[in-house]
UniProtKB/Swiss-Prot annotation:
Protein name: Adenylosuccinate synthetase
Record Gene3D superfamilies: Adenylosuccinate Synthetase, subunit A, domain 1, Adenylosuccinate Synthetase, subunit A, domain 2, Adenylosuccinate Synthetase, subunit A, domain 3
Role played: Plays an important role in the de novo pathway of purine nucleotide biosynthesis. Catalyzes the first committed step in the biosynthesis of AMP from IMP.
Organism: Nitrosospira multiformis (strain ATCC 25196 / NCIMB 11849 / C 71)
Residues binding GTP, per UniProt: 13-19, 41-43, 306, 332-334, 419-421
Molecular function terms, GO-annotated: adenylosuccinate synthase activity; GTP binding; magnesium ion binding
UniProt: Mg(2+) binding residues: 14, 41
Organism ancestry: Bacteria, Pseudomonadati, Pseudomonadota, Betaproteobacteria, Nitrosomonadales
Catalytic activity: IMP + L-aspartate + GTP = N(6)-(1,2-dicarboxyethyl)-AMP + GDP + phosphate + 2 H(+)
Pathway field: Purine metabolism; AMP biosynthesis via de novo pathway; AMP from IMP: step 1/2
Length: 435
C-alpha cells in the first residue's frame, strides 16, 4: 500500500527542505512541486557537491524517481529550460523523468517588469519580493487572464491571450509607474522559440499522480517557501503569493486530500527570515552574527543575507496547527554548537482587546499584531562539543538532547528527524515518515 508524505516549511522559508526531500526520496517513487515558482531555492549537498534547484523537484537528483510540477506552480519557460540545461550538463536525465502540468500559469516578461516596478515604487515600504514575477503571475491566474502552459501549443490562442495581458500590464507600467513597456512581438517570438523543448515534458499531471498512487507508488509532495509566508495564514502583507501550507498539496497538484497520509514540518533549530516583515525573536548581536556565518544564511535564490534569531515556538505552533503536522524535522542543529546560553521563545507578551498586556503561546494573525509582540524566553545551557555529522540521537551532547526535548514539549509535536549537517547522510531518524 502506498504512503504519501507532504514536506512543508514551518517558518519563513529556508528551513532546509531540499536536503530532507532528497533524503526521503530513497523511499519515494515520485516527487511533486505544488506551489510557488522559481523564487524557491532548494540547496542540496550530496557527497560534498552542492546543487541549487529553484523550480524542478529535488527528487530529480535521485535516479529513477519521477518528478512532477503541479498546476499550483507558476512557470517561467526560460527559467525552466535553464534549470533543465544545468542538470543535463551535470549528467542528470531530466526529460524522461519530469512532467509538468499543462494547467501551470506562465511567468512572462511583463510580470517581471511589473514586480520590479512595484518594489521600486514602494521604496522603504517594499515587501522584499525576489523580483521574478511570481506575484503578478498569480494575480493573472486569479483574474482569469493567465496564459497557461497548454496555450503555448496553439499559436493563435497564445497570441490572443498574450495581447490581452500586455494591453493591461503595459497600461499600468506606462501610466502608473512611468516604466518601459514590454514588447508584444519580442515576447511572443522568444516564448514560442522554447515550445518544442518544453513540449515533451507537458502532461496531465493529476491523472499521472492518480495512476501512480493506484499502482502503489509512494509520493512525496515538496513545499516551497514556508507556512508563515502563506498568502492567507502568513504575516500578511509580508507574504508570498501562493498557499504554502500542506493543504495546498491537493489543490496545487490535483490529488485528493484522502491520499495524503503524513505531514513533515521542517524547522531550523533557530529562526531566519529574508526580506521585510515582523520577526519577534530577531537578534542583532554576536549570537545573531554567529548563526548567520556558521549557518551560511544567504538566500539561495536572491543571495540576500537572512535575518537570524532565536527559535520561536509560538510561531511554530501556529504552523503546526494550520498544517496538521504529523512530526517535525529539526535542521541545522550543528549551527548552535558553541553558543554558551540558548534562549527558546515560548510565547509573547501582547496587548489584549482591553489594552491590557497578556501572554500568548501562539503567534497572532497578521503582521501588525505580530509587530507589537514582545517575545518571552526560557534560557537553557548550550553545548561546546560538535554535533556535525552525528547520526544517532544518544550521541548528541546532553544539552542538545535537552534542547530538542524542550522543543517537543513546548510545541506538542514529536521530533522525528534531526539534521546535523548539509550532506544527505548527516541525518538522525527517530521515526521515518514513510514507515
Amino acid at each position: 500500500m502506498s504512503k504519501n508524505v507532504v514536506v512543508i516549511g514551518t517558518q519563513w522559508g529556508d528551513e532546509g527542505k531540499g536536503k530532507i526531500v532528497d533524503w526521503l526520496t530513497d523511499q519515494a517513487q515520485g516527487v511533486v512541486r505544488f506551489q510557488g515558482g522559481h523564487n524557491a531555492g532548494h540547496t542540496l549537498v550530496i557527497g560534498g557537491k552542492q546543487t541549487v534547484l529553484h523550480l524542478i523537484p529535488s527528487g530529480i537528483l535521485r535516479k529513477d524517481v519521477a518528478c512532477y510540477i503541479g498546476n499550483g506552480v507558476v512557470v517561467s519557460p526560460q527559467a525552466l529550460l535553464d534549470e533543465v540545461g544545468m542538470l543535463e550538463r551535470a549528467g542528470i536525465d531530466v526529460l524522461s523523468r519530469l512532467r509538468i502540468s499543462e494547467a501551470c500559469p506562465l511567468i512572462l516578461p511583463c510580470h517581471v517588469a511589473l514586480d520590479n516596478a512595484r518594489e521600486i515604487a514602494r521604496g522603504l515600504g517594499k515587501i522584499g519580493t525576489t523580483g521574478r514575477g511570481i506575484g503578478p503571475a498569480y494575480e493573472d491566474k486569479v483574474a482569469r487572464r493567465a496564459v497557461r502552459l497548454q496555450d503555448l501549443f496553439h499559436r493563435d490562442r497564445f497570441a490572443a491571450k498574450l495581447g490581452e495581458i500586455l494591453d493591461y500590464h503595459n497600461f499600468v507600467l506606462k501610466n502608473y509607474f512611468q516604466s518601459p513597456v514590454v514588447d508584444f512581438q519580442q515576447t511572443m517570438d522568444e516564448t514560442l522559440s522554447l515550445v518544442e523543448r518544453i513540449r515533451p515534458m507537458v502532461a496531465d499531471v493529476p491523472r499521472l499522480l492518480f495512476e501512480a498512487n493506484r499502482a502503489g507508488a509512494n509520493l512525496l509532495f515538496e513545499g516551497a517557501q514556508g507556512a508563515l509566508l502563506d498568502i492567507d495564514h502568513g504575516t500578511y502583507p509580508f507574504v508570498t503569493s501562493s498557499n504554502c501550507i500542506a493543504g495546498a498539496a491537493t489543490t496545487g497538484s490535483g490529488i485528493g486530500p484522502q491520499m495524503l497520509h503524513y505531514v513533515l514540518g521542517i524547522t531550523k533549530a533557530y529562526t531566519t527570515r529574508v526580506g521585510a516583515g515582523p520577526f519577534p525573536t530577531e537578534l542583532d548581536d554576536d549570537v545573531g552574527r554567529h548563526l548567520a556565518k556558521r549557518g551560511n544564511e544567504f538566500g539561495a535564490t536572491t543571495g540576500r543575507p537572512r535575518r537570524c534569531g532565536w527559535f520561536d515556538a509560538a510561531a511554530l505552533k501556529r504552523s503546526i496547527q494550520i498544517n496538521g503536522v504529523s512530526g517535525l524535522c529539526v535542521t541545522k542543529l550543528d549551527v548552535m554548537d558553541g553558543v554558551e546560553t540558548l534562549r527558546l521563545g515560548v510565547g509573547y507578551k501582547m496587548m489584549g482587546k482591553g489594552e491590557e498586556e497578556k501572554f500568548s503561546a501562539i503567534m497572532p494573525v497578521g503582521a501588525e499584531e505580530l509587530a507589537s509582540c514582545e517575545p518571552v524566553y526560557e534560557e537553557m545551557p548550550g553545548w561546546s562539543g560538535s554535533t556535525v555529522g552525528i547520526r544517532n540521537f544518544e550521541q548528541l551532547p546532553m544539552a542538545a538532547r535537552n534542547y530538542l526535548k524542550r522543543m517537543e514539549e513546548v510545541c506538542e509535536v514529536s521530533i522525528d528527524m534531526i539534521s546535523t549537517g548539509p550532506d544527505r547522510e548527516e541525518t538522525i531518524v527517530l521515526r521515518h515518515p514513510f514507515e
